[in-house]
From Swiss-Prot:
Main function: Plays a key role in steroid hormone synthesis by enhancing the metabolism of cholesterol into pregnenolone. Mediates the transfer of cholesterol from the outer mitochondrial membrane to the inner mitochondrial membrane where it is cleaved to pregnenolone.
Catalytic activity: cholesterol(in) = cholesterol(out)
PROSITE patterns assigned: START
Feature: transit peptide: 1-61
Keyword Amino-acid biosynthesis among UniProt keywords: no
Protein name: Steroidogenic acute regulatory protein, mitochondrial
Pathway terms, separated by semicolons: Steroid metabolism; cholesterol metabolism
Length: 285
């Protein structure tokens, strides 16, 4: 029997977790169903690009042996991607929160069962592959360039696409929102020229709640990166963010903090890429 900790990881039955191939197949069928909905009239061009060039289902399913707990994490990551795609394909109901002179646009909407979610859209000067390498391969270095993050630590890797992370956020100016920590399952995919980094909160035996931090909840979240239609050397960057910061914080404060956090993140990412920090670190290793 799975420990209670892992039963909380995903709302799936023990019998379903016994077969990894079936589990991944069912999750991918669900993703394929979402992509099918996006292929009709008015579908966004980037989803059509994914389907045309290299769909999420195009690669063969590797025969990998995972523990039951690891299977649970893999399914959670795939579920985060599936839910995020479903949210992003629905263009109705988004309200503008921020529109900056640098091109960042943050929008929000309220979803049943999830709450308020935020979507940032911007075009970045860097190539998609370079951004993916920085955000995925150099994930643990994020605290070096993003002052809103104190630490990112990879607790466990499962195959090539799934990992469990522990992240500590910094307090906001004036300590309006104190330090939070998160335990997330992350699911990273590169399909054709489009890259995904999806995630959601989970539990891990190696990281119980920590003294001095409020354990916040995250997800579904997803960063989608693809070459710009106007210039393939630039990247169309879309970030879906859903957070429950916990604690007694007014909603107006939460909304302001989260939308501004997205804009700040993009600006810090620009600075990081311009400095070549991630590339320099890779060469030094």
């Amino acid at each position: 029997m799975l420990p209670a900790t892992f039963k909380l990881c995903a709302g799936i039955s023990y019998r379903h977790m016994r077969n990894m191939t079936g589990l991944r197949k069912n999750a991918m069928i669900a993703i394929h169903h979402e992509l099918n909905k996006l292929s009709g009239p008015g579908a966004s061009t980037w989803i059509n690009h994914i389907r045309r060039r290299s769909s999420l289902l195009s690669s063969p399913i590797a025969e990998e042996t995972y523990s039951e707990a690891d299977q649970c994490y893999v399914q959670q990551g795939q579920e985060a991607l599936q839910k995020s795609i479903s949210i992003l394909e629905d263009q109705d109901g988004w309200q503008t929160e921020i529109e900056s002179i640098n091109g960042e646009k943050v929008m929000s909407k309220v979803l049943p069962g999830i709450g308020k979610v935020f979507k940032l859209e911007v075009t970045l000067e860097q190539q998609t592959g370079d951004l993916y390498d920085e955000l995925v391969d150099n994930m643990e270095q994020m605290g070096e360039w993003n002052p809103n993050v104190k630490q990112v630590k990879i607790l466990q890797k499962i195959g090539q696409e799934t990992m469990i992370t522990h992240e500590i956020s910094a307090e906001t100016p004036g300590n309006v929102v104190g330090p939070r920590d998160f335990v997330n399952v992350r699911h990273a995919k590169r399909r054709g020229s489009t890259c995904f980094l999806a995630g959601m909160s989970t539990q891990h035996p190696g990281m119980p709640e920590q003294k001095g931090f409020v354990r916040a909840e995250n997800g579904p979240t997803c960063i989608v990166m693809r070459p710009s239609a106007d210039d393939p050397n630039k990247t169309k960057f879309t970030w879906l963010l859903s957070l429950d910061l916990k604690g007694w914080i007014p909603k107006t404060v939460i909304n302001r903090v989260l939308s501004q956090t997205q804009v700040d993140f993009v600006n810090h990412l620009r600075d990081r890429m311009a400095s070549g920090g991630g590339i320099d670190a890779a060469i030094a290793c």
